Amino acid sequence: MKKIFTALLCVAAANAMADDAAIKRKLQSFNISNIVIKSSPISGIKTAVTDQGILYVSEDGKYLFEGKLYELTNNGPVDVAGKILVDKLNSYKDEMIVYPAKNEKHVVTVFMDITCHYCHLLHQQLKEYNDLGITVRYLAFPRAGMNNQTAKQMEAIWTAKDPVFALNEAEKGNLPKEVKTPNIVKKHYELGIQFGVRGTPSIVTSTGELIGGYLKPADLLRALEETAQ
């Protein structure tokens, strides 16, 4: 009986892999790239993590939809895509520019652009965020994409010997004199697209929830405490 059960599991796994491969081929035919097929919390629906963002596909590959998918919990709606991507987000921790809170209560990751007014405003208030127990981690998200000077300047900042100093200087208007091909920045940008980032700053909680744009320190703390309940 145990051997039969194991064999059935193997057949089911093989069928699932075959279905995933078929879905992948179908998406590739529409020029969707770097596809990873995952399960979803909805029966009959698969999650496709792609360079173009998170997509949801029926198991037969006939239907596709894009947009936010929320799990309705007792504490309110939770973005499913963020939960899927949070491990990938944290795998970039060594590439983040981090401003740690001494008495850390919350950690947020901010997709930022050095030309963004509200990013400047957020950066100017870092001490206030830190004093409230909020650690801020930055990832690069040049709003104009990869083929521009800002992306190259941000690459120089993120790969500097002292990235914190380099970013602080850039925020004062002292931009890098030498620029670099945006390799790390490209990874950050693509992750931002997967999260659904459309502008900066975009704030992501430790659970992968995308809060949105700039929030004053006290307002951000309130939002984080509400999502943590």
Swiss-Prot record:
| Annotated GO CC locations | periplasmic space
Q: Which controlled-vocabulary keywords does the entry list?
A: Disulfide bond, Periplasm, Redox-active center, Signal
One Pfam family here: DsbC_N
| Signal peptide from the UniProt entry | 1-18
Question: What does the subunit comment say?
Answer: Homodimer.
Family assignment from sequence similarity: Belongs to the thioredoxin family. DsbC subfamily.
Spell out the protein name for this chain: Thiol:disulfide interchange protein DsbC
Origin organism is Haemophilus influenzae (strain ATCC 51907 / DSM 11121 / KW20 / Rd)
